[in-house]
Amino acid sequence: MAVANGLIFSQEVGPKIEFESLEVDYGEISKGDNGVRIFKFTNTGSEPLIINKVYSSCGCTIPKKPSSPIGPGQEDEIQVKYDTNRIGPIRKIITVLSNAINSPTISLKITGNVE
């Protein structure tokens, strides 16, 4: 805590997660195309960030999380693989659970269309 002019300021201590983007748009892709996309994030907090679980709203989307804690100031990524053999619109949610004090649960979105 810091005191200035009689006011008390406290800074939250702990891991914080900040994603570059909460949505990835595949755009128009062809059946069988590469379905892997990346969500990049940074631990902007003061303690190690642990991604506890990442899951998808559908079995057609397979997320992959970091296996080790992410130190303060470090960057990492959540990899998402969509089954592009499924023709039609892509509208899926990937949920990330972590020990982040600012957002312990985050919903990521993928959109697009497989032709």
Regions found by a protein language model. Name each.
Residues 1-13:
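Bacterial Sec-dependent N-terminal signal peptides
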Residues 47-54, 106-108:
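Short, hydrophobic/aromatic beta-strand segments
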Residues 31-38, 85-93:
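Short, solvent-exposed loop/turn segments enriched in Ser/Thr/Gly
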Residues 10-40, 115:
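Beta-sheet-dominated interaction scaffolds and their linkers
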Residues 87-115:
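Terminal connector regions
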Residues 24, 74-80:
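Short strand-edge motifs at loop-to-beta-strand transitions and within beta-strands
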Residues 41-45:
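Asparagine-centered strand-capping/turn motif at beta-strand->loop junctions
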Residues 57-64:
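Short, solvent-exposed loop/linker segments at beta-strand-coil boundaries, enriched for Pro/Gly
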